A protein has these predicted regions:
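Single-stranded nucleic acid-binding surfaces, predominantly the OB-fold ssDNA-binding core
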Residues: 1-114
Length: 114
């Protein structure tokens, strides 16, 4: 079984594009935190991980319309590793979460004052 469940905050606004056939694809970066206890001073320690998520079709359209940086999000899907050659000819790899569904959690983040 290949199943991933994440809850975190969007680290950036989604990047949504359409393929030549008209299918929407959204790339999202989700930040999750793991609690690591407290340091000697009693301050909370945590580790932040950044995950690459990819959504297709209606999910991608929804992401483009309603998601923005800072939004708390539940996402589930499956892991997929892609590879490519960079400009120096090195083979690169990236593991992504292909999103099956997501839910908005909490209120919309406040706009920053200008």
């Amino acid at each position: 079984m290949n199943k991933v469940i994440l809850i975190g905050n969007l680290a950036a606004d989604p990047e949504v594009k359409a393929t030549p056939k008209g299918t929407y694809v959204a790339n999202l970066r989700l930040a999750t935190n793991t609690y690591l206890g407290k340091d000697e001073g009693g301050n909370r320690k945590q580790q932040t991980e950044f995950h690459h998520l990819v959504a297709f079709g209606k999910l991608a359209e929804f992401a483009g319309q309603y998601l923005q940086k800072g939004r708390l999000l539940y996402a589930d899907g499956r892991l997929q590793t892609s590879s490519w050659q960079d400009t120096a000819g090195q083979k690169r790899f990236r593991t992504e979460v292909i999103v099956d569904s997501f839910e908005l959690l909490g209120p919309k983040p406040q706009e920053e004052a200008a």
